Amino acid sequence: MFCYSSLHAQIISGTVSAEGQVLPGAAVIIKGSTKGTSTDFDGYYTIEAQASDVLVFSYVGYANKEVTVGTNTQIDVALEADNTLDEVVVIGYGTQRKSDLTGSVSSVSAEDVNVNPVSRVDQALQGRAAGVQVTQTSGAPGAASVIRVRGGNSITGSNEPLWVIDGIVVGTNFNLNNINSNDIKSIEILKDASSIAIYGSRGANGVVLVTTKTGTGAGSSKPEVSANIYTSMQMVPELPKMLSQAEQIAYTNESAAFRGAAIPFPNDPSTYPNNDWFDLLLGPAPIYNADVSITGASENVSYYTSLNYFNQEGIVKTSGIEKYIFRSNLDIRLSDKLKTGFRVNYSYIDQQNGLVGYGNAIATLPTQPIYNEDGSYNGFDEVVGSPWSNPIANMALNTNETFRNNFLGSFYIDYSPSEKWIIRSTFSPDFDNSKQNRFTSSQSPNLLYLGEGGNASVRTVNTKGWNNENTIQYQSEIGENHRITALGGASFQKVSTEIVESEAFGITNDATGFNNLSNSDPTRNILTSDYSGFQIASFFGRLNYAYKDKYLLTLVGRTDGSSVFSDDNKYEFYPSIAAAWKISEEGFMQNQETFGELKLRASYGKSGNQAIDPYRTKGLLVEANTTLNGIQQTGLTLGRPSNPNLTWETTNSLDIALEASMFNGRVFAELNYYYKKTNDLLLDVTIPKQTGFNSQLQNVGSLENKGWEFSLNTTNVRTDNFNWKSTLMLSSNKNKILDLGGVDFIDLVVDELLGSGNTRLIVGESVPVFTGVKFLGTWKSQEEIDASGLRDPQVVGGAKYHDENGDGIISTDDAVVLGSPLPDLIFGFENTLSYKNLDFSFYFQGTQGNEVYNLRMRNHYFNRGEFTKFAEVADRWTPENPTSDIPRAGGDSVTGTPPNSAYVEDGSHIRLKTVRLAYNMPVDKMGMDGVKNATVYLTGTNLLLWSDFRLIDPEGSNFGRNGIGNIAQGYNDGSYPNPRTITLGLNVTF
């Protein structure tokens, strides 16, 4: 029998490929035996088999394929991606089968990124990944989103995740407008210690890995050309409801009468202007986008090249962004063992920063005239009695624009001495240059009134840096039961930034604008320059071990050295350990049909945050003047104390998760629980006044984050003509301050007008919390005031506040916790349906249980007559309406308006984020020769919003204000509205 089989054996050869590219290392095994081989660097294999044998072809991330040998001597196989747990995901410095992951990684596909038109990729992540909160704080063209991965770990430092684009660490200051979203192949978000420890001191806030598209069509000389063209119309969303012109006049007159001031509007309302500032300053605005890419490959070269043009006008007039982006990705196989290539991205951006704010539309009285009687622009506010910055004049006369050039590249070389070893070195330069030109005309009416002349400034920022990564990877199977992958590497990065700014005042001739700053008053001009830089050296390693494909272990360690710290604290080690148990591979699970995959995993580790400016360990010298012998002298003095003991903020994280694939892959669910504790928080601590300073930055305090995440992906219906899939993302995060360096609380100021007391860091509370006094409505009678025991002035109809400490005075000492901007629940829910050539999807996202601090309440609800009022103020307290709880006009002149509970509103909301209808043209039936596929689509974005918030959109926020962006979360003063958008587009491939 044996001799017969040998005589009829034959040599089979061929190549194994996937998605147009050869697959080195693919397994080729004779089914039912242990006999097999693997493909070489070119994807080529040879094996001896009989005609009756079945060859099984397999590769990580792709579905197995079986082929009967028969009479064939050459069998070429193309594998298809396996979209179950065996899909390949990108991790730090490599890839891994999803089924082998021991850490928490969320994947966002290119389809999810491009389902609705966005100018920045971060805008496309909202609601797409459990545990990742994305807040679109502004609808301005090109505006950044705020991203929190499993909560914020720092109080004063950055809480933004680390962005890594094609292996290039770009940091939190990188402008994501530089990247074309249509170039993106996939996005992975690393969330737990096991995943992020490989990035050490910069991984504590999570890591976002962006992988761009590469060449396809290996072995084919014919390139593939794709084009994606769309146009959008943005519409102004629902706006806050304000008093009518006549109602506003009545309110302003009441306020003046109560204060004993002159009545500003003594005549009939019809004799005064009735300007709709929303209509004057906001309006529909278009978006134009064109993407063209070419991709292909020859025997040894694969390439992807694209060009993108994007132009978005803003719904707030004079705002907008125009972008040109070029990308080229090239891979060259020099030999069986040597490969090289590059990833290059260049962008040019012209951003119009806007000459008027949305706040102008909310705040300006409808009675404020635009023009004087002689036709010139009005520049004086009669109600306030001071010069007024006329927004219509600003749009016509002034300039505020930013130009940016960015080059981001990565050049690599791979050497594979054998199938088990890969040695890689990359060099990644990053150059960014921006220039902001600002000009305010001398003819601006408020400046004409003051006689100050115009002003202009030119600000240039040049950032240059490089990153060198060197890794060596070894992977091997030891016997039938053991599989290991080991990675070691070293990373070096250097970044420097130079800023030069010139400001000129007293410009009398507008002809040259900001192009001739010498045309000004030299005694008032300001010249500034600044330089900063840092270097990081890192050494890291990772070991992945699998036993019988059931038990998985991952060990990670990284040592970072940073120039921002002193010599004694320059280096820190970040370790992690993770393990996973594939329960579904156990013998007792083999006879059940529910679970295809069932995995329990856990991880624990340490990551860091070097959340300080490069020179904060050192003292700061500032310019100071003194008088010697009657002559003023200028010198330098110490303006900030040094602290050589500053070190890294460190976060220790625990993650436990259960993953399950059920019912033949039709249901995939994942449940995570995590706990994070951050120590050595960087805070300004009060120090003895004998030092000459009030405070010093120190490592004190700690906080914790804990929460859960749940994701569910289901295939509800799957037939030849109809498919229906659903995705649900739920997550909840709670944080708490554990220690503030020995004090119970720290008061902070988020808004200068509100003064202190509107936010406070409190041990045992979240970061941040809103604080203020309790608003109790209005005083209904003098008897009620007299019985209250309050010693400070009160007035019938005025605002009534709770005296928390009972001292008879309403002050910040009466402040209590009023709420938190952190939601109890973050959710996203998507349904995708396809019938024959039609695709339809809709996507909801939102939050529940968060509060918003409405900064507009002070001016538009309480008693300042020079500002417009919310429509509900028409029902305010008056002698004829004595039961109202809305304060009377002018009452603030007696009681003041401290930060109070009326400012805090429910921020829970549901947003219909995206609706998309697409038709995939049957190009073959339509006789469209040369066209591979064509899709026409219609998309709606931000179509509906359910919210009780007065300013309509609760996502608007003051992140970044006063340099305390983490604390300003949830503070909303009516930021730039998120528009409703309708998009019509065509995607075609030749």
UniProtKB/Swiss-Prot annotation:
Any idea where this protein resides? Cell outer membrane
Q: How does it sit in the membrane?
A: Multi-pass membrane protein
Q: Name one GO cellular component term.
A: cell outer membrane
Q: Which InterPro entries match?
A: CarboxyPept-like_regulatory, Plug_dom, Plug_dom_sf, TonB-dep_OMP_SusC/RagA, TonB-dep_OMP_SusC/RagA_CS, TonB-dep_rcpt-like, TonB-dep_rcpt_b-brl, TonB_rcpt_b-brl_sf
Annotated region (Disordered), positions in chain: 878-902
Motif TonB C-terminal box, which positions? 974-990
Superkingdom, according to UniProt? Bacteria
Asked if the record carries the keyword Iron, the reply is no
| Residue span, TBDR beta-barrel domain | 220-990
Limits of the TBDR plug domain: 97-213
Q: Where is this motif: TonB box?
A: 86-93
The induction field says:
By ulvan and rhamnose.
Major localization class: membrane
Q: What does this protein do?
A: TonB-dependent receptor probably involved in ulvan degradation. Ulvan is the main polysaccharide component of the Ulvales (green seaweed) cell wall. It is composed of disaccharide building blocks comprising 3-sulfated rhamnose (Rha3S) linked to D-glucuronic acid (GlcA), L-iduronic acid (IduA), or D-xylose (Xyl). The TonB-dependent receptor may mediate transport of ulvan oligosaccharides from the surface of the outer membrane to the periplasm for subsequent degradation.
Q: What is this protein called?
A: TonB-dependent receptor P26
Give the originating organism: Formosa agariphila (strain DSM 15362 / KCTC 12365 / LMG 23005 / KMM 3901 / M-2Alg 35-1)
The major lineage groups are: Bacteria, Pseudomonadati, Bacteroidota, Flavobacteriia, Flavobacteriales
